[in-house]
Amino acid sequence: MEYNPIKKVVSGNYAAAYAALHARVQVVAAYPITPQTSIIEKIAEFIANGEADIQYIPVESEHSAMAACIGASATGARVFTATSAQGLALMHEMLHWAAGSRLPIVMVNVNRAMAPPWSVWDDQTDSLSQRDTGWMQFYAENNQEVYDGVLMAYKVAETVNIPTMIIESAFILSHTYEVVNMIPQELVDEFLPPRKPLYTLTDFENPIAVGALATPADYYEFRYKIAKAHEEAKKVIKSVGKEFGERFGRDYSKMIETGYIEDADFVFMGMGSLMGTVKEAVDLLRKEGYKVGYAKVRWFRPFPKEELLEIAESVKGIAVLDRNFSFGQEGILFTEAKGALYNTGVRPIMKDYIVGLGGRDFTVRDVKAIAEDMKKVVESGKLDKEIEWYHLKR
């Protein structure tokens, strides 16, 4: 069957819901929280209208939502959930249980700033604070990537048995409508066949225990296997991304999407929706004579250090745009990028720009101002400061 996209004008949240529908998820357990709520409302609408054969489990909290997802996934079901900010934080214990149990749950997290003070706007700190739980993380630039990301996440997660977050920006994507090219169900089914679990709690001929006690003689190897699965996931991500591109014309074979790096003196590096702004600004800056490119990190976990090294070898500087902050240190992507390059001996000059916290606007004008600053840094070979809180009111 030839691929002819079904074009729908949808929000990022609706794109996530349609992707869950097309992935033929069997169980959804979730608790509503702004700005995630409309994902679950749309799925409930699919069920009420008879469009979806999904077991929906209403729960009293996000902790319970993930607990229900863990139980359902352990029976062999394809499971979906969604959350945001404080809800994700409440799930924290269960995120470890899902990853440690090697359950390929897919969750959409709508990036929202952590309270207090209360905020419902975009900020990556909620998802990045869960980076050590064992979940893979994919950051979507636009609504199309939300839809595509969910479909690819199931194929990757079910291959390596690691749960996966697809992460979108609050309101900038979650409640903003744009055209999304959806895939006919028959073609999704060809790309994403039913899950074939390694084990299930319902295989009574081969009984298993999940989450049992491991003594010091055994625990270490369990951690090692998860670490190895994340390394293996890099190959699977690239393979699945390439296959997706061949089938549907949107290539995801690179964990870091790049542009104009062939002759760039420096690049902007960041994740998520802000990279759409960066791309527009870079096009304008190139016309003005700036030798600048971009590197959009799609997958933060597993971290694509091999692709980062290739980029770092070709440029003099990297301006890291962090819509997050780790108190007592620096922006989280900045830390990861520096650490990945340290033992390679490849050391382009790097500066961390803290931008857009709590949903503060990040515009083309801002990118241009940062480009001017980074140009001076690269030309002088000296940092005036390592961390720039760009948006501070002065």
UniProtKB/Swiss-Prot annotation:
InterPro entries xref list: PFOR_II, Pyruvate:ferred/Flavod_OxRd, Pyrv_Fd/Flavodoxin_OxRdtase_N, THDP-binding, Transketo_C/PFOR_II
CDD domains linked: TPP_PYR_PFOR_IOR-alpha_like
One MF annotation (Gene Ontology) recorded for this entry: 3-methyl-2-oxobutanoate dehydrogenase (ferredoxin) activity
GO terms, biological process: organic acid metabolic process; response to oxidative stress; sulfur compound biosynthetic process
A Pfam family recorded for this sequence: PFOR_II
Transport keyword on record: no
Keywords assigned by UniProt, alphabetized: Oxidoreductase
Catalyzed reactions per annotation: 3-methyl-2-oxobutanoate + 2 oxidized [2Fe-2S]-[ferredoxin] + CoA = 2-methylpropanoyl-CoA + 2 reduced [2Fe-2S]-[ferredoxin] + CO2 + H(+)
EC number, as in UniProt: 1.2.7.7
Known partners and oligomeric status: Heterotetramer of one alpha, one beta, one delta and one gamma chain.
Family matches, as PANTHER family: PYRUVATE-FLAVODOXIN OXIDOREDUCTASE-RELATED
NCBIfam families: PRK08366.1
Name of the protein in its database record: Ketoisovalerate oxidoreductase subunit VorA
Organism whose genome encodes this protein: Pyrococcus horikoshii (strain ATCC 700860 / DSM 12428 / JCM 9974 / NBRC 100139 / OT-3)
